[in-house]
Amino acid sequence: MILVTGATGLVGSHLLVQLLQENEEVKALFRSEKQIEKVKNVFAFYNQTALFDKINWVKGDITDIPSLEIAFENITHVYHCAALISFDPSDEDELRKINIEGTANVVNCCIDFGIKKLCHVSSIAALGNPKEHETTITEETEWNPEELHSD
């Protein structure tokens, strides 16, 4: 079975449609039941409302290890799509808790539960801004661990 974190978000909800169209068995992590309605709308957009009922929903949070451990039961593969996106400096503590500690929790659960494959979905925004002489960021862009976005 595949676990999708961030299943109620933009990428996670579209990923759910794709996985279910491929007849995968999917467990989806959610924090708020009202967000599940948004996922229904994504399935309706693709005319796949019948597939929506095949989702195994589990309430949890990547920052809450006990709820993650419950979510990881009977899982073989994980798509980690959960993250907080904000460019507001006042959100730094919450960004670190969710995006760094939460991701570490997911990775540790993958190790503890013997997960076969983890796919971490992220954003190019995590790499920061290009340097003055660069116009784009690519796989060849130099990674500088001293940059603020690198931790």
Where is each model-derived feature located?
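N-terminal Rossmann NAD(P)H-binding glycine-rich loop of SDR-like oxidoreductase domains
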Residues: 2-24
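SDR active-site strand-loop-helix element
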Residues: 5, 29, 78-82, 118-124
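Short glycine-/acidic-enriched loop or helix-start segments at secondary-structure transitions
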Residues: 14-15, 38, 89-90, 129-131
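Short, well-ordered alpha-helices that flank and scaffold nucleotide-derived cofactor binding pockets
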Residues: 17-21, 41, 108-112
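Conserved Rossmann-fold NAD(P)-dependent oxidoreductase catalytic core, especially the SDR/UDP-sugar
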Residues: 25, 92-93, 97-151
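Glycine-rich phosphate-binding loop and adjoining beta1-alpha1-beta2 segment
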Residues: 30-50
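NAD(P)H-binding glycine-rich loop region in Rossmannoid oxidoreductase-like domains
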Residues: 44-98
